Amino acid sequence: DRNVVGGSACPPSMLAAFKNDYNCDTIHAWGMTETSPLGSANQLKAKHQQLSEQERFKLRLSQGRPPFGVDLRLTDEEKGNHEIARDGEQIGNLQIKGHWIIDSYFGKDESALTTDGWFDTGDIATLDEDGFLCISDRSKDLIKSGGEWISSVELENLAMGHSDILMAAVIAAEHPKWDERPIVIAVKKPDSTVTEQGVLDYYTDKIAKWQIPDRVIFVDSIPLSGTGKMLKRELRAQYGQVLLEQNPV
């Protein structure tokens, strides 16, 4: 059995649950309205059958490869849109090109593409030598703390791995020293007694110490769009200055 997940990145804990509890393989797919809608799907190559189950699981966490007719590339905006190598390590702005990819929006005269014909998705990602795409974050949701980038998606996936967390969103909160720091907005599972410190301790040894969020704020619900995506702009408006309030300049 298998299922397909798209819309947002599937936490590793969910992929593991589908496999372990239901013997169901999960296929990651990615796309946008602007890509009509498929941009990539995760089907492992024949050579990957030689990998261990753990290595294949890690590869399945990616959003996979583009279908025939679609090209992907990564660029560095700070270096004049210079293309970034496909090494699975370097992150860049994800751009896409193909015959069914948008070239302009309805009612707009100007092109939606770069000068050389690519559509900028607004995602930050890596590409490996086989073309497997791994989206790190939306560019607007990346957290820049002391000059270093922190992925909100990675922190959310870790939080969702906690047995007492039902839903979690990570946002950038303004900080008087580091400019921005990550905070977790979380919904507990029913009857959970987990504490803020308990969730923060859960991050220990899973990521670098400087990436561990500064706060965990428990809420009854997280605002969602009509398609079920978390509305981080509303969370930023409500909680974006919480660290300034506790650490006034």
Segments (PLM) and residue ranges:
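Conserved donor-binding loops in enzymes that form glycosidic bonds
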Residues: 7-8, 221
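Conserved AMP-binding/adenylate-forming
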Residues: 2-3, 10-29, 33-133, 139-142, ...
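Conserved beta-strand segments of alpha/beta enzyme cores
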Residues: 25, 71, 167, 215-217
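Hydrophobic/anchoring residues in structured secondary elements
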Residues: 5, 170, 217-218
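Active-site and channel-lining beta-strand-loop segments
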Residues: 71-77, 220-227
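Acidic/polar alpha-helix N-cap and adjacent early helical turns
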Residues: 238-249
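AMP-binding/adenylate-forming catalytic core of the ANL superfamily
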Residues: 98, 104, 124-211, 221, ...
